[in-house]
Amino acid sequence: MSGTNNVAQARKLVEQLRIEAGIERIKVSKASSELMSYCEQHARNDPLLVGVPASENPFKDKKPCIIL
């Protein structure tokens, strides 16, 4: 039984390695420069950088707490 399990595991491993071998790879330097360029181009639309206008913020309290 363990022999068939080992064969099945080995086949799964080989299949996974074939999939990974087919993935296109690029150098980290190229990927990082593309990522930096993308971030710089889209920074003006990023709510974490520019903030969300109070009128458009769905999490802002509409009314203050009356209890306090």
From Swiss-Prot:
A lipid is attached at C65 (S-geranylgeranyl cysteine). Keywords: Acetylation, Cell membrane, Lipoprotein, Membrane, Methylation, Prenylation, Transducer. GO terms for molecular function: G-protein beta-subunit binding. GO terms for biological process: behavioral fear response; G protein-coupled receptor signaling pathway; locomotory behavior; receptor guanylyl cyclase signaling pathway. SUPFAM superfamilies: Transducin (heterotrimeric G protein), gamma chain. Its main location: membrane. The modification N-acetylserine is found at S2. Residues 66-68 form a propeptide. Gene3D superfamilies: Transducin (heterotrimeric G protein), gamma chain. It is a lipid-anchor. InterPro entries: G-protein_gamma-like_dom (IPR015898), GGL_sf (IPR036284), Gprotein-gamma (IPR001770). The modification Cysteine methyl ester is found at C65. GO terms for cellular component: heterotrimeric G-protein complex; parallel fiber to Purkinje cell synapse; Schaffer collateral - CA1 synapse; synapse; synaptic vesicle membrane. Expressed in a variety of tissues. G proteins are composed of 3 units, alpha, beta and gamma. Belongs to the G protein gamma family. This is Guanine nucleotide-binding protein G(I)/G(S)/G(O) subunit gamma-7.
